């Protein structure tokens, strides 16, 4: 089953009949419009390309304008692609709504996490701090040793060090679908999802469900 592109609206909570409070993230999923269908013969794999939302006319590049015009759909703010399974068929110009999640119990949500700028190892990787006293006057939050000696004579790739924190693609798996509001194009999922309010999200049926 394909996924859809949505937008993070924010968090709230809803109550069950027993009075239990459930924290939910509200995701607005406007109708996704199919701009291209890829097939095995021409592209080597089966997939659909979709767009959503809108874009100011003066912001649409000429190649984009031609691509959207060929599909007969309004120019959207982005393009995303979803692989098709056997038996799934879509046509160019078709509109796909949030209702495809009506029978889905859990979803995976992918977004871009909030950027935190340059961060040290304590904040970025949860390193322990060194002694506050006992002779330590300069190295309270430094990482310590980052390698060995002449052998191997280098720092191993992947070593956890200070650097950019956040602003990277993050996927949260198996979030429970609490409610699907087709009238308002809303999907409510239990828990938090990556990204700032207003950021784009990709919602897919959970692979581990």
Curated annotation (Swiss-Prot):
Tagged with keyword rRNA-binding: yes
GO biological process, one term: translation
GO molecular function: rRNA binding; structural constituent of ribosome
Family matches, as SUPFAM superfamilies: Translation proteins
Keywords associated with the record: Methylation, Ribonucleoprotein, Ribosomal protein, RNA-binding, rRNA-binding
PTM entry text: Methylated by PrmB.
UniProt xrefs under Pfam families: Ribosomal_L3
N5-methylglutamine: residues carrying this PTM: 150
Gene Ontology annotations for the cellular component aspect, listed alphabetically: cytosolic large ribosomal subunit
UniProt superkingdom: Bacteria
Keyword match rRNA-binding: yes
Assembly with partners or alone: Part of the 50S ribosomal subunit. Forms a cluster with proteins L14 and L19.
Biological function: One of the primary rRNA binding proteins, it binds directly near the 3'-end of the 23S rRNA, where it nucleates assembly of the 50S subunit.
The family this protein is said to belong to: Belongs to the universal ribosomal protein uL3 family.
Name the UniProt record assigns to this protein: Large ribosomal subunit protein uL3
Natural source organism: Proteus mirabilis (strain HI4320)
Organism classification: Bacteria, Pseudomonadati, Pseudomonadota, Gammaproteobacteria, Enterobacterales
Gene for this chain: rplC
């Amino acid at each position: 089953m394909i996924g859809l592109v949505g937008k993070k609206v924010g968090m709230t909570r809803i109550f069950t009949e027993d009075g239990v409070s459930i924290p939910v993230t509200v995701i607005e999923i406007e109708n996704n419009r199919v701009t291209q269908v890829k097939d095995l013969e021409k592209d080597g794999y089966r997939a659909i390309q979709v767009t959503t939302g809108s874009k100011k006319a003066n912001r649409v590049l000429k190649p984009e304008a031609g691509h959207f015009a060929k599909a007969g759909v309004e120019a959207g703010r982005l393009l995303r692609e979803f692989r098709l399974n056997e038996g799934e068929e879509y046509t160019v110009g078709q509109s796909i709504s949030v209702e495809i999640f009506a029978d889905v119990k859990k979803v995976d949500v992918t977004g871009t996490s909030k950027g935190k700028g340059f961060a040290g190892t304590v904040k970025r990787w949860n390193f322990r701090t060194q002694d506050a006293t006992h002779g330590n006057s300069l190295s309270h939050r430094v990482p310590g040793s980052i390698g060995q000696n002449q052998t191997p004579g280098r720092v191993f790739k992947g070593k956890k060090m200070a650097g950019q924190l956040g602003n990277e693609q993050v996927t949260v798996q198996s979030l429970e679908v609490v409610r699907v509001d087709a009238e308002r194009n809303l999907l409510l999922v239990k828990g938090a999802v990556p990204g700032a309010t207003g950021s784009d999200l990709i919602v897919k049926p959970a692979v581990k469900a």
